Regions:
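Sec-dependent signal peptide cleavage junction
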Residues: 18-32
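Non-catalytic, beta-strand-enriched accessory regions in extracellular/secretory proteins
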Residues: 40-60, 103, 168-188, 231-233, ...
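Short, surface-exposed beta-strand/strand-loop-strand elements in extracellular ectodomains
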Residues: 77-90, 204-218, 328-340
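C-terminal edge strands of extracellular/lumenal beta-sandwich accessory domains
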Residues: 28-34, 51-53, 115-162, 179-181, ...
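Surface-exposed loop/edge segments in extracytoplasmic proteins
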Residues: 89-96, 217-225, 339-348
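Hydrophobic beta-strand segments within beta-rich accessory/binding domains
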Residues: 54-76, 116-120, 153, 181-204, ...
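Bacterial Sec-dependent N-terminal signal peptides
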Residues: 1-8
Length: 391
């Protein structure tokens, strides 16, 4: 959750992010130590006054801030308060201006032991419109939660680890926020990744999220763009020990379209299976052995699946591909017999098909399956098998 600088309206709160007012705490600014989960009662007496607080995260989980006041004083609040949050380096991460109602911030996910700075000041630098003398109650709440992301996880190197069969909750706090997670495959088979929207608020989901899967070399494996509802990704057929990175960020890095402050849950689970292809099988050299029925899918526009078997008898063989239901895009199916440069089969299909070819006993057979450029069946599960039909 890269909470780089943000302003968000709550009630009548003013969107300050667009004004470029973010920065750092001034070096001479002194801070008051506060204890998480205890109220601090203070007020602003001067238009230029800044009340700065310092808190240390006391447990792993998430945090938020409440700022409340006596409702009978609402007419004296005027343009309200501005609340800012800074990291341990005193770089501003979050800002909300024009707080004139009971306020609860977004959730943060700072690591245990980290220092956080919070400031409260007049929402507008004017003696006439400031909330002079109105006491506010400030509370920095911390909540224990072992399943919550931990800052800063906005780069590969800082990715949060997801345990086997585990889940993690997170959120994006601004248009530039990115969350990275890493998962190591515990068994050869297929891995399922699901994305659940915990706070389903259509007016805030807007353009939705992009969820991208990368391999250990940071090469794109699969991308789900514009997520606006719960979704489960296609099976990821990966080998034991392989590592994947999961990146979550706004589809559109524009304040008016980014799904900020909406909590999501990311779940990852691996099912052991010997019936699936094993990535990376994108070349003759890395072809998977074809024995019985193999399941596979095309995960991106450059993904190619290679399979191989050795002819046990001399005669005719039938290769069958089952593309499943409602396939809108096309597969290219190619077969090679003992010669990687000569095609014994070369067909395009959008439905279940069988192809026959001849092979002699002991000859190597390769099958290559990939999507047609611009019309690739990305994410669609298919199955492949062969059998000897006659001499």
């Amino acid at each position: 959750m890269k909470k780089k600088l943000m302003g968000l309206a709550f009630g009548g709160a003013f969107l300050a992010a667009s004004l470029g007012v973010f920065g750092f705490v001034k070096a001479e600014t002194t801070s008051e130590d506060i204890t998480p989960n205890l109220n601090v009662v203070r007020s602003i007496e001067d238009k230029d006054q800044v009340n700065m607080y310092k808190a240390v995260i006391d447990e792993k989980g998430y945090q938020n801030i409440t700022l409340n006041f006596d409702a009978s004083k609402k007419d004296e609040v005027n343009n309200g308060w501005t609340l800012k949050v800074y990291d341990e380096n005193k770089e501003e991460l979050y800002q909300v201006s024009g707080i004139k109602a009971q306020f609860t911030s977004a959730n943060f996910a700072f690591a245990k032991g980290k220092t956080v700075y919070i400031s409260v000041e007049s929402g507008i630098k004017s003696s006439m419109f400031m909330p002079k003398g109105v006491e506010y109650n400030l509370n920095f709440h911390t909540y224990a939660d072992s399943d919550y992301e931990t800052e800063n996880n906005n780069k590969y190197i800082d990715a949060n680890e997801i345990p086997t069969g585990g889940a993690v909750k997170g959120s994006l706090l601004n248009k530039d926020d990115e969350d990275y997670f890493v998962y190591q495959i515990p068994e050869t088979g297929y891995t399922k990744v699901s994305f659940e929207i915990l706070d389903f608020v259509p007016s805030k989901i807007l353009g939705g999220w992009n969820l991208e899967i990368y391999d250990k070399n940071k090469s794109l494996v699969y991308k789900e763009a514009g997520i606006t509802k719960d979704v489960t990704l296609p099976e990821l057929p990966l080998a034991k020990g392989q590592k994947i990175y999961i990146r979550i960020h706004p589809k559109l890095a524009v304040s008016t379209f980014a799904p900020v402050e909406i909590e999501y849950k990311l779940k990852v689970n691996t099912v052991k299976s010997g019936k699936w292809e094993v990535e990376n099988n994108g070349s003759f050299k890395k072809a998977n052995k074809l024995s019985g029925t193999k399941y596979a899918n095309i995960l991106n526009s450059s993904d190619e699946d290679f399979f191989t078997f050795k002819a046990a008898k001399t005669g005719r063989y039938k290769l069958s591909i089952d593309t499943g239901d409602n396939v809108k895009n096309a597969y290219k199916v190619e077969g090679f017999v003992n010669n990687k440069s000569k095609k014994a089969v070369s067909k395009v299909t959008m439905s279940d098909k069988s192809y026959t070819f001849k092979a002699k006993r002991g000859q190597n057979v390769w099958v290559r399956i990939y999507g047609i450029s611009g019309n690739s069946p990305i994410g669609n599960k298919y199955s492949l098998k062969y059998k000897f039909v006659k001499k």
